[in-house]
């Protein structure tokens, strides 16, 4: 399978700062294979190997699409979350960009129950707005925002993905562990402080640089889009616009919450959790 969409050069990677690893005292010896040299107290990543590893991984990404499987992008640290979200939406794939909740892969029943709760709250806010007190509406709106923030990118994911694309596997170690437990391959952007052992497709690079992350994730995204176009697969965003009221109207004017408000929110949340099951 020839790679048409890896037009990156070593110069592109260098311009994005992809070659800068961590300080030499913060390295993982298992990354030695991908290190070019030590300079000014930093390890410099071998960008020729970065390019080679990326090119080797692309046919596997396209094979996932050809097999009618999905890709789950995971990147919750601040440098990655916007890039991950944008790329997944453009490619029509799923994503986690805020917080990995334990069991997102290994206990999908619990996650689906949370999604049912989210659906229920949206319906209640849309249909029963006139019957809710301002306080009840505010509590529901807050609960809605919490759930949506964490579940937005996997809300319509019906089964386990065929591939995880991860930025910084040491930061996303729970996601990687769950994927390995289920036999799901992992492609990861891996810095010099990470253990590459559990990763199926190691892309050695600076995983703390926004430019570096964006450059490599965009290549992955473009290959997914290209594979879908060739197969005539429609690209459908994992995030759908929903007919819900403007939730800002329900937001509390105070940033600090009392213990009583927290208790009331929990009670209301339990009520809807129970009705959604």
From Swiss-Prot:
GO terms for molecular function: structural constituent of ribosome. Pfam families: Ribosomal_S2 (PF00318). Residues 247-277 are annotated as: Disordered. InterPro entries: Ribosomal_uS2 (IPR001865), Ribosomal_uS2_bac/mit/plastid (IPR005706), Ribosomal_uS2_CS (IPR018130), Ribosomal_uS2_flav_dom_sf (IPR023591). GO terms for biological process: translation. Keywords: Ribonucleoprotein, Ribosomal protein. Residues 253-264 have a biased composition (Acidic residues). Residues 265-277 have a biased composition (Basic and acidic residues). It comes from the Bacteria. One of its GO terms (cellular component) is cytosolic small ribosomal subunit. Gene3D superfamilies: Glucose-6-phosphate isomerase like protein, domain 1, Helix hairpin bin. NCBIfam families: rpsB_bact. Belongs to the universal ribosomal protein uS2 family. This is Small ribosomal subunit protein uS2. It comes from Chlamydia pneumoniae.
């Amino acid at each position: 399978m020839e790679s048409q969409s890896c037009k990156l050069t070593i110069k592109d990677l260098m311009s994005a700062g992809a070659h800068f690893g961590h300080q030499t005292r913060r390295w993982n010896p298992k990354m030695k294979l991908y290190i070019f040299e030590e300079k000014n107290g930093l390890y410099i990543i071998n960008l020729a190997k970065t390019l080679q590893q990326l090119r080797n991984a692309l046919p596997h990404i396209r094979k996932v699409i050809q097999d009618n499987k999905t890709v789950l992008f995971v990147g919750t640290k601040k440098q990655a979350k916007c890039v991950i979200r944008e790329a997944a939406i453009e490619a029509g794939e799923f994503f986690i960009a805020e917080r990995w909740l334990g069991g997102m892969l290994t206990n999908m029943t619990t996650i689906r129950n949370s999604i049912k709760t989210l659906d229920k709250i949206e319906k209640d806010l849309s249909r029963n707005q006139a019957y809710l007190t301002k306080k009840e509406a505010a509590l529901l709106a807050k609960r809605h925002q919490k759930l949506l923030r964490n579940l937005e990118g996997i809300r319509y994911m019906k089964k386990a993905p065929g591939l995880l694309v991860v930025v910084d596997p040491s930061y996303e170690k729970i996601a990687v562990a769950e994927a390995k437990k289920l036999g799901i391959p992992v492609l990861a952007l891996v810095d010099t402080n990470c253990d590459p052992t559990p990763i199926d497709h190691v892309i050695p690079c600076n995983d703390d640089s926004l430019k570096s992350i964006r450059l490599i994730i965009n290549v992955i995204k473009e290959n997914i889009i290209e594979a879908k176009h060739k197969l005539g697969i429609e690209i459908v965003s994992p995030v759908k616009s929903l007919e819900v009221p403007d939730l800002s109207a329900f937001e509390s004017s105070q940033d600090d919450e009392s213990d009583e408000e927290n208790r009331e929110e929990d009670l209301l949340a339990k009520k809807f959790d129970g009705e959604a099951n």
